Amino acid sequence: MIAANPLATTLDRQADWELDFYSRPILEPDGKKRWELLISSTPCPEGGDPFRYARRCPAGDVNSTWLASALRDALTNAEAEGWRPPRRLRSWRSAMRTMVQRAAAELQIEMVPSRRTYALIDWMEERSREVYPKEEGYMAGPLAPPPAPLSTPAVPLPEAVRGDAWTWATLPLGSLAEAGEWPLGFNGLLPIHPGMDPDQPIPGLRLFSPTRALALAGWLGGLEPVRLRIDGRQLILDAGQDDSWLVTDLDAEGAKAAHHAFTTTRQHTQGLQFIAVQTTPDNPRFEGFWMLRDQPDP
């Protein structure tokens, strides 16, 4: 445990946490797979180093009691680095939902089941490339075929989240980097990697409602939007832990164009996308604005 720095009297940073508690591709000397807790703070749009925490867990101690104790230790470490406790933590594994909820509740931290954990997944991919292969007991390939992922059929968006009108839009990446200066209501902004082309167009969706824009934005934020994707001729919004929402049906040409735009942004700009909510197309204020990432599932 890291002792608090007595000179650090001001906790000037706060962010949500992104958490994964699961086994890793490493066999311990006792023949059991390694379990590990990973925590990353959600980065602010302005950048800066995130808070990160990694801790191994003996396979026989995988329970909410151990996890709550580890969370307390993570809170102590975060305080020593000048971080206030998080208001909420996000966790994306359905299999671990109950355990994480119990541990978070013990520390009075709200747990949000959500795949909107972009920073954590980036870190997990980094560890899979650079850390685990160097460990003794590393399993270079699965010992058995991985289970097929459960796909949730898309259902129509709730009435409260449907705009009166919608349209496709693109914004240059450099413009998105300035989104923190825009007049925003509900929002979820992401940092922009400085090495990417600022002129690269980012695809997105604009929703309009002259009378319900603010309420619509509030509902949409509660869904925890993750990414837009094309399935056949349908525009799908993946959200939350495993939700898929049907936004609209497209004609063949529209579906092809959207698929191309999403593929291009995956290749060049980390899969960045956006959803905007406005009263009218001419209103400069966004009642809601979320940056999304079409990121590979870990």
Predicted regions and their residues:
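Secondary-structure boundary/capping micro-motif
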Residues: 1-298
